[in-house]
Amino acid sequence: DVCSSDLNVSVRIPSVFNVIKVETAGEMNKAIKKLIPSQDIFISTAAVSDFKFEDKDTHKIDSSKALSINLKPTIKIIRQIKELNPDIFLVGFKAEVNISKEDIIASAKQQIKDAGTDLVIANDVSDENCHFGSDNNKVWIVDDDIVSVPLSSKKEIANIIFDVILEKI
């Protein structure tokens, strides 16, 4: 099963997958709660927003005066996965901006600690060759080991990630 939002997805998902369309973090959370108990592997590629509007206006906002917007944190979906299915093999992604390799790896290891991920794919999206929407990337695959994947096509990286997952399960 694939739970997806069309907001930022430009990849064609093969028809062998059951696609569940969602628009909000809440909808994704609800769909995942139904799916996770019956799955063996969960690859959490979604970049779910960390914040949402605290209040929604139901009327037109007056543009003649200053405006303050209050945000509140959204639920961290990935942190619920192991609670729903302790035996699932959980793969997370960690995108960072303008930080060192050591800090990216530390951030990935923190996700392993916080969410119970078995494997984290980490990268720096501020790199001009590896930004969101780019066809290429360079990543670190992190668990007890660290595999550095140099600049490669995203398809090549996906194959490497799947090879690592298959070695681990």
Where are these regions (language model features)?
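Short loop/helix-cap segments at secondary-structure boundaries that form the rim of catalytic
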Residues: 10-17
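Contiguous, function-dense segments enriched for cysteine-driven chemistry
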Residues: 6-10, 30-33
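Glycine-rich phosphate-binding loop
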Residues: 22-93, 98-125
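Flexible loop/turn segments at secondary-structure boundaries
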Residues: 12, 99-100, 129
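Structural signal for short hydrophobic segments within the conserved structured cores
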Residues: 18-20, 147
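Short, small-residue-biased leader/transition segments that mark boundaries at the very start
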Residues: 1-4
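Glycine-rich phosphate/adenylate-binding loop
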Residues: 87, 104-169
